[in-house]
Amino acid sequence: MSAEILRVHPDEPQPDRIDYIVSCLRKGDVVALPTDTFYGLAVDPVNLQAVERIYQIKSRQKHKPLSLLISSLAMAYELARDSDPLIDRLADRFWPGPLTIIVRAGTKLPLRSTANTGNVALRVPDAAIPRAVVERFGLPITATSANLQGASECTHAACVRDQIGDRIPLIIDGGPTGHSMPTTIVDLSLGPGRWEILREGAIPTHEIVMVLQR
């Protein structure tokens, strides 16, 4: 069966459609939706059956953890094990935006949701649809890219439909995404004051370094 495609306004998401998306997530469905970089696959990260479905849909290796979309720095600290001034610095400068921050996970997430790493990758997207979903849901949602393992990432809903439209029940069409580059990833899980840039993406490395070394 092909996925249902639901149009949602990218800047002013219709509340009734956000409610529908949230109801699907609460049922354990996998939902493809736009972020500010690529389209992503959203599920409730506490629902381990839904998390498992994402790995099956993408043919993704089980040791690779899924990043999470959140709505605020406060939500980040609800999910992180420790407070860290470096999180504050990066969030103040780059959130909402295409920056993923890896931290040690707290007790709110099942270990399996971290791919048994004990770490969690978080970001606040600069996109109204996923932020509205997270705020209405009251929990983070997963944000792994909505494509098959090894295939190109999708910046529009038709690409998602063509790649995995027969594997998921719902695709949110919010138009093209704002970037054609992945997020920049910074690892803060290494210990107090320690950090590593794992991937340069939409935010250049030198901008990250300037913030972390000030």
Task: Show where each model-derived region lies.
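Active-site-adjacent structural elements in enzyme catalytic cores
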Residues: 1-214
